[in-house]
Regions:
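Hydrophobic beta-strand scaffold residues
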Residues: 65, 109-111, 167
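Non-catalytic positions within long, well-ordered alpha-helices that form the structural scaffold/packing
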Residues: 27-30, 104, 127
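Binuclear metal-dependent hydrolase catalytic cores centered on His/Asp/Glu-rich metal-binding motifs
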Residues: 77-110
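Conserved beta-strand positions in the central sheet of alpha/beta enzyme cores
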Residues: 35-36, 112, 135
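Charged catalytic cores and adjacent phosphate/nucleic-acid-binding surfaces used
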Residues: 5, 9-15, 19-20, 24, ...
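Aromatic-lined carbohydrate-recognition surfaces of secreted/lumenal glycan-active proteins
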Residues: 110-120
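An N-terminally biased module of ancient metal coordination in phosphate/nucleic-acid-related enzymes
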Residues: 1-75, 177, 248-251
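Active-site-adjacent beta->alpha loops and helix N-cap segments on the catalytic face
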Residues: 44-51, 93-102, 149
Length: 252
């Protein structure tokens, strides 16, 4: 069983595809679920109801649509947290209440630190024990080929404080070009959202890219981390060379 994590539909201001189109694209790619994480600031209570209802209507025996919201937390440095699960979202009277209920332990969903490579791998102290996961591989910011070296370092450091922490791989998809061959491969089949969330929270999956994969709870030693660091540097060098050989066309 496979699925895609961290997708945005046109419920978000920067999403280009409808939920129906996202599902069609996922099914065409032989995926069994998608975890949608819309920007929370785009929602009021009424829009949240419509969103949850549509996710439910698109879920069937062969495909699960898991709703979520992406929250922007401002402080010393802005971080984004993905809050995932229908039960969590339904129990909030307004979208702004979702984060508080999630992190207080009132709900059974997932809270995942999104794309840490975007914000210098910073995490507020008060989140270290309260989140369930870290997006250690974000295809939009880290490439589809390799996970982020420093995100994995952050994960392994925080897991010493939070033994239930799980690593996730997400697309951060906003349009068709965002389908970057990065998926979650579950160890057990799931028929319902609650069952899928239980397995995700427990880390019963691996993260697979087109050429490399990583367990949801990486505990890498020196050799693997060195290889990843070298691989990231080679990838960066290849991107620079590609840009020099074929620089982007100048706009008229």
């Amino acid at each position: 069983m496979e699925g895609l994590f961290h997708l945005h539909s046109d419920y978000s201001f920067d999403g280009k595809l409808s939920l129906e189109k996202l599902k069609e694209e996922c099914v065409r790619r032989k995926q069994n679920f998608m975890v949608v994480t819309e920007h929370a600031e785009d929602f009021d209570a009424e829009k949240l109801k419509r969103y949850l209802a549509q996710c439910k209507s698109l879920t069937d025996r062969d495909f699960i649509v898991v709703p979520g919201l992406e929250f922007r937390l401002e402080g010393e440095m802005e971080v984004h947290v993905l809050v995932i699960g229908t039960e969590t979202l339904c129990r909030a009277e307004a979208p702004r209440d979702v984060m508080e209920k999630m992190l207080s332990g009132e709900c059974s969903g997932l809270a995942v630190l999104a794309h840490p490579s975007r914000n210098g791998h910073y995490i507020p102290k008060d989140l270290e024990h309260r989140i369930h996961g870290i997006e250690i591989w974000n295809a939009a910011y880290d490439s589809r080929y390799l996970p982020d070296y420093w995100a994995i370092r952050l994960f392994m450091s925080l897991r010493k404080l939070n033994r239930n922490l799980v690593g996730f791989g997400g697309l951060d998809l906003h349009d068709r070009s965002g389908f970057r061959e990065l998926k979650l491969q579950m160890r057990h089949p799931c028929r319902k959202e609650a069952e899928l969330l239980t397995h995700l929270k427990a880390g019963r999956f691996s993260i697979r890219g087109p050429y490399a994969g990583i367990d949801s709870v990486p505990d890498w030693g020196f050799a693997k981390m060195l290889l990843l660091n070298v691989g990231r540097k080679l990838l960066a060098g290849a991107n620079i060379l590609k840009w020099k050989l074929a620089p982007p066309a100048k706009s008229a």
